Design a protein with these regions (language model features):
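Beta-propeller domains with acidic blade repeats across secreted/periplasmic ectodomains
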Residues: 1-196
C-alpha cells in the first residue's frame, strides 16, 4: 500500500513506510482506531490482499468499535476488509467465535476458520448485502469432519479434545501442483493446539 505496509496493532491500524532505504520506517501513520484490546488473541489478524484489491482480515470477540470514512461501525468475530489507503472499512461475514483463518479459492470465494470446533466456514453473501439492521451469521460451517490428527502424542487442549479448538489458518488448494482431486476442493487448516 503506497510503497509501505499496513500493520494491525490494536487499537490501531497503522501505515509504515521507509523513505530513505535504511530499512526503518520514516513514516508512521494511524489509518484508523477502534480495535478492541481486552483480549489480544481475539483482535485483528491474518491480513491478506484480496482479489478485489482490498485488504481482508479476521477479528475475534475483541471486535471493532469506531469510525472510518465518516461511518460508525461495531462488529466482532468475523471477516472484514479495508481499502489499502484506510479510507473505508467493511464488516463482511459474521462467524460464531474468534476468527483467525482466512483463505480464498481461485474464483475469489472467501473461507475462514474459528475456535471451538469450527475449522471451515464458507462466506457466501456478505453482511453488507443485508443492510444495517440485520444481525446474525452470514457465513456457514462447511467442515464435514472436525477432528484433527496430530503427529505428536502429547498435545494440550482445554475444550475440544481431538478436534479443532483453534482453526488458525485456511489455505485452499488452488495450485496445479496438487492432484486434481484436491484442487478447489481441499483446504489446509492449521491447529496450533495440536501442533498442526
Amino acid at each position: 500500500a503506497r510503497g509501505g505496509i499496513i500493520v494491525a496493532q490494536a487499537p490501531d491500524f497503522l501505515f509504515f513506510k521507509d523513505t530513505d532505504g535504511d530499512d526503518r520506517a520514516d513514516v508512521r501513520e494511524v489509518l484508523f482506531s477502534g480495535w478492541g484490546v481486552n483480549d489480544t488473541h481475539a483482535g485483528p489478524s491474518n491480513l491478506r490482499h484480496g482479489f478485489d484489491n482490498w485488504i481482508w482480515g479476521t477479528v475475534g470477540y475483541s471486535g471493532y468499535r469506531g469510525e472510518v470514512g465518516g461511518k460508525k461501525l461495531g462488529f466482532g468475530s468475523g471477516v472484514f476488509r479495508i481499502k489499502p489507503d484506510g479510507s473505508q472499512l467493511e464488516f463482511m461475514h459474521q462467524f460464531n467465535n474468534n476468527t483467525w483463518g482466512l483463505g480464498f479459492n481461485s474464483s475469489g470465494d472467501v473461507f475462514g476458520s474459528t475456535a471451538n470446533n469450527n475449522p471451515s466456514f464458507f462466506c457466501g453473501i456478505p453482511a453488507t448485502a443485508y443492510g444495517t439492521g440485520k444481525k446474525g451469521m452470514s457465513a456457514r460451517m462447511i467442515a464435514t469432519d472436525r477432528s484433527f490428527h496430530p503427529i505428536t502424542p502429547n498435545i494440550r487442549q482445554v475444550d475440544a479434545f481431538n478436534n479443532y479448538t483453534a482453526g488458525a489458518g485456511q489455505t485452499v488448494a488452488t495450485s496445479a501442483g496438487f492432484p486434481e482431486s484436491f484442487r478447489e476442493k481441499v483446504a489446509f487448516i492449521s491447529g496450533p493446539t495440536g501442533h498442526l
